Amino acid sequence: MNMSQASVSFQDVTVEFTREEWQHLGPVERTLYRDVMLENYSHLISVGYCITKPKVISKLEKGEEPWSLEDEFLNQRYPGYFKVDHIKGIREKQEKPLWQEIFISDADKTLSKEGQKVLEKPFNLEIAPELSEKISCKCDSHRMNLPVASQLIISERKYSRKKTEYMNVCEKLQLDIKHEKAHAEEKSYEHGENAKAFSYKKDQHWKFQTLEESFECDGSGQGLYDKTICITPQSFLTGEKSCKDDEFRKNFDKITLFNHMRTDTRGKCSDLNEYGTSCDKTTAVEYNKVHMAMTHYECNERGINFSRKSPLTQSQRTITGWSAFESNKCEENFSQSSAHIVHQKTQAGDKFGEHNECTDALYQKLDFTAHQRIHTEDKFYLSDEHGKCRKSFYRKAHLIQHQRPHSGEKTYQYEECAKSFCSSSHPIQHPGTYVGFKLYECNECGKAFCQNSNLSKHLRIHTKEKPCDNNGCGRSYKSPLIGHQKTDAEMELCGGSEYGKTSHLKGHQRILMGEKPYECIECGKTFSKTSHLRAHQRIHTGEKPYECVECEKTFSHKTHLSVHQRVHTGEKPYECNDCGKSFTYNSALRAHQRIHTGEKPYECSDCEKTFAHNSALRAHHRIHTGEKPYECNECGRSFAHISVLKAHQRIHTGEKPYECNECGRSFTYNSALRAHQRIHTGRKPYECSDCEKTFAHNSALKIHQRIHTGEKPYECNECEKTFAHNSALRAHQNIHTGEKLYECSECGKTFFQKTRLSTHRRIHTGEKPYECSKCGKTFSQKSYLSGHERIHTGEKPYECNVCGKTFVYKAALIVHQRIHTGEKPYECNQCGKTFSQRTHLCAHQRIHTGEKPYECNECGKTFADNSALRAHHRIHTGEKPYECNDCGKTFSKTSHLRAHLRTRSGEKPYECSECGKTFSEKSYVSAHQRVHTGEKPYECNVCGKPFAHNSTLRVHQRIHTGEKSYECNDCGKTFSQKSHLSAHQRIHTGEKPYECNECGKAFAQNSTLRVHQRIHTGEKPYECDECGKTFVRKAALRVHHTRMHTREKTLACNGFGKS
């Protein structure tokens, strides 16, 4: 005889609650209920029960409440809408009846060592096919014909719960037991103390009348109707059982026992050998469950115990990478049946419904129903915690969970560490953190996680996946429900960014809408996110809850701590794709990449100057506003930047935290250390685009470029004089104030600038830290080294705008320009004489004081000028470093070389203002001008004879001393003057270097050439005072005066004069 198989749905092995019933359960009872339900479902899956994951299981796995007002609301609007399709889908996909795979007879059951029932031989429960085909259920309450019993159950449960019509079980077939129960509203279980009746499922009774037996809990000796409470994994095989309470001796079903144990807290179970203490019944059951379950399922790979088989199975699949379910179309593998079924619906295009208002197609029923609330804007639940937020919710579970932060309630507690949580999912997730095992590992980077959801979020970093997309604006969202919470008009505000988290999306939407609902009660500042508000409030409270375990430094933000810890680890996870440079912070990488792109997105509204960083723009704004918000507590000085303040405070503390690894020298600033290290490396990364000169520092390059641009941005407020360098301005301002802050401890000399004092100290110490890489010569100042290096390179970067002459040093250019301007800013306080150079003034003042601080180590001779001492040293060494490029002649002084070059070129740039006479050297002009003034400042100490020139005085003094220090090497003749020796030597050599431009005649001496040139010019500069006759040479004047006028006077005295 042909028989059809009757299949069983998941509802046959589950317990459902109404809203009122769920309210009576306590936290421990709800947790126990969740564990039982999840365990039952895991065993159904393990024996091949293929089904889309029930909604109640999904809720329990997420830690949500299994009952919500949404279910009741949807069933009122769409009676039987969900369970019909669910049952149809199961029957269409099921290849053979599940009765054969799940249920076994009582005779075929055996008991394992752990006390679990083992499935060995299945049995069949058969129904006549003619009856099976005619099954049709009718609801008498509202006269509806329903195709299956489950649909009738839903309809009757919602509309006719108060009716008490009874149906014959045998006449209506056992399949209508649920419908009969809904009409009967039977209440067969009663508590003896308060005679309260309860209504729960009894549909297992007719199927398993022969399987009734009573289970007793080994831990407390308490009789229970269902061994599930005592951790029997086959609770779905048992029908209703007898539950025995030791105190009341009453029978209860599962949920009645839960409620009874919740109210009856007086009862204690005394003999718990596992824990050695007495406790209430609820705690005993829970402890017994935890104790026994942890030993049932153990992972051999990781050594971790599980209370249910499903986590063990999932753990093993994670380790082995085994996937039980494979897609036929795309060959994608899945470790869970629920994920496989959802994937098949996606590929097949099996969409539950398409919404009429927005044409969005959704794959799941819950998504469709929840999506409808977006358009209707139905939010049933309103939070009114003392008028704090007035926030509304679609679901009551969300409202309850939202209210816990307001009330401070933490209902769920983890017993290992006594930590409590607001959400039921948190203590479930917490043990993984507490124990330290992480089941879920990333295949890309090897990072492990306690929760699969965290692994899924982490994988989006590698895949850059944004899970869901809204067609309205091109954005990606966490779910279709969140994606449609804003209209397409709102989405047009930006260009399609993507977000992988719901919180990110909501925060981004508030930015677009300008919404800032969270306000600080201290300062009134508003924020778009509550996390931003909490972080901001720590500014007022000073709270820094995050502490570094390495250095004990505390931070107000957890992200700041994470970033700080990279200082200790040296981690630089962010790498530039262009140059490969790595950075500690992502923001630093983005800022660095602007170097390659040249992007400067931040523009000043006052001067339109652009910046690569927003911080640089803010700092720049303070130039316009003059704001200096950061003040030093020690000296009261204020600064525009906090970094400058911190660096300034090191002056007071003396701290120098930055040390050079090469030489051990320490610095106050990190930038100073980096600049110093370039001395060791010789690196000069900054190059001038005009002259290609390189510099070790960017600031030096900017200062150098002012030479080409002529820019002088620093102006003196007193005299309006401008300067190219800020340091030069500060030094100049000390001239007006007369203040000299820096004093030498050795000699007491004071200076305007600290750098001048540092340079001066090297005179006492003899330190010369700057060495020439070409010749090894050392210098006390870096500027001296730079000037010296130009001798090797021949570079003369400073050019005169008037005559085009170039100079090695800028100071030489400035002095030269005074020739054209006639400026002599330095005046002698004694005689009022002015000088174009400060050094000339200092040398002149020594004439009045008689000071000669520079002494020759060879002969002990002293000099007023250091340059004169150096020139004197060359007499002993015979050094003549200055060579003429035309004739090869060398000179000991550069002034002699310049005079020699002018002799060859005939250049005479210096002109007498009185007579217009020109000279090749400036000293010649000064000496010549004394002819007009009659000044003779140099006087002989022996005879008192004055002289116009110092050189003439020195020559004269040799008459008194008889000194003739210059000797001819050829004939041994000695001379008192070097010029006389040079002239004498030309007799031996026959050299005549001085040539007349008019007739080409050559002479041995320059004085002879000058006398000869008077023949061509007709000049007779020497005039007789007696008769007014003029002569070309001075010697001729003397002869004339002797012969004519002296002789006449002699004759007149002797009586021979004319009568």
Swiss-Prot record:
Cross-link (Glycyl lysine isopeptide (Lys-Gly) (interchain with G-Cter in SUMO2)): K178
Keywords linked to the UniProt accession: DNA-binding, Isopeptide bond, Metal-binding, Nucleus, Repeat, Repressor, Ribosome biogenesis, Transcription, Transcription regulation, Ubl conjugation, Zinc, Zinc-finger
SUPFAM superfamilies: beta-beta-alpha zinc fingers, KRAB domain (Kruppel-associated box)
Zinc finger motifs (C2H2-type), residue ranges: 325-347, 352-375, 381-406, 412-434, 440-462, 518-540, 546-568, 574-596, 602-624, 630-652, 658-680, 686-708, 714-736, 742-764, 770-792, 798-820, 826-848, 854-876, 882-904, 910-932, 938-960, 966-988, 994-1016, 1022-1045
GO CC terms in record: nucleus
Domain KRAB, first and last residues per copy: 8-79
Keyword Nucleus tagged: yes
Residue ranges of coiled coil: none
Record localization: Nucleus
GO molecular function, one term: transcription cis-regulatory region binding
SMART domains referenced in this protein's UniProt entry, alphabetically: KRAB, ZnF_C2H2
Family named by the database record: Belongs to the krueppel C2H2-type zinc-finger protein family.
Function: Mediates transcriptional repression in response to zinc. Represses several genes, including SLC30A5, SLC30A10 and CBWD1, by binding to the zinc transcriptional regulatory element (ZTRE) (5'-C[AC]C[TAG]CC[TC]-N(0-50)-[GA]G[ATC]G[TG]G-3') found in the promoter region. May play a role in the control of ribosome biogenesis, regulating predominantly rRNA levels, as well as those of several ribosomal proteins, thus coordinating this highly zinc-demanding process with the available zinc supply.
Protein name in the entry: Zinc finger protein 658
Organism: Homo sapiens
